[in-house]
From Swiss-Prot:
It holds the Pfam family SKI. ATP binds at residues 14-19, 120. CDD domains: SK. GO terms for biological process: amino acid biosynthetic process; aromatic amino acid family biosynthetic process; chorismate biosynthetic process. Binds 1 Mg(2+) ion per subunit. Its EC number is 2.7.1.71. Catalyzes the specific phosphorylation of the 3-hydroxyl group of shikimic acid using ATP as a cosubstrate. It catalyses: shikimate + ATP = 3-phosphoshikimate + ADP + H(+). This is Shikimate kinase. One of its GO terms (molecular function) is magnesium ion binding. GO terms for cellular component: cytosol.
């Protein structure tokens, strides 16, 4: 059986995936790869511009290709885009190649984090009902994909990172 030596962080936009994956990368001494950053590099465009010009379907296709390419290399921390779980193909890739950590966040926490960001293609502060519906539709996908779930509520990035490290040790002891 193939070892799941990549660690993929998943969760809704605003869950803290980018900040926490950066810190986790530093603490574990593993390179950090962001699916969104790889897409922006390949396309030469920002994520919001790709959504606007080419649509979500095109973006999701690019995201799948990037995830496949990233998973060709071992021992990485992968910062996944919030919607990566929406394609079954991506879930299969992650299950084969990654230990998946779901950063679970409460809707009110997400809303507070997102309301000041203008570069979120699927979020607008005036449409929190849309965010709630989107989150609700993705929750079962996040939970199903996760090997480990860590709540981010009322925790600093360092606290979440420590909890992930503890969970990784427990996971390795029970699965190895």
């Amino acid at each position: 059986m193939k070892t799941k030596n990549n660690i993929a962080l998943i969760g809704f936009m605003g869950a803290g995936k980018s900040s926490i994956s950066k810190l986790l990368s530093e603490k574990l001494g593993k390179p950090l790869v962001s699916t969104d950053a790889c897409i922006e590099t390949r396309e030469g465009l920002s994520i919001s511009h790709i959504f606007k010009e080419n649509g979500e379907d095109y973006f999701r296709q690019m995201e799948s290709k990037v995830l496949e390419d990233i998973c060709q290399n071992p021992n990485q921390i992968i910062d996944c885009g919030g919607g990566i779980v929406t394609r079954p193909h991506n879930l299969s890739i992650m299950r084969l190649n990654c230990l998946v950590v779901y950063l679970e966040s409460r809707p009110e926490d997400l809303e507070n984090r997102l309301k000041n960001h203008t570069n979120r293609p699927l979020f607008n502060a005036e449409r929190s009902d849309k965010m709630l519906k989107l989150l609700e539709s993705r929750l079962p996908l996040y939970r199903d994909a996760a090997d480990i779930t860590v709540s981010t509520h009322n925790k600093s990035c360092h606290e979440v990172c420590e909890e992930i490290e503890d969970s990784l040790r427990k996971y390795e002891n029970t699965s190895g």
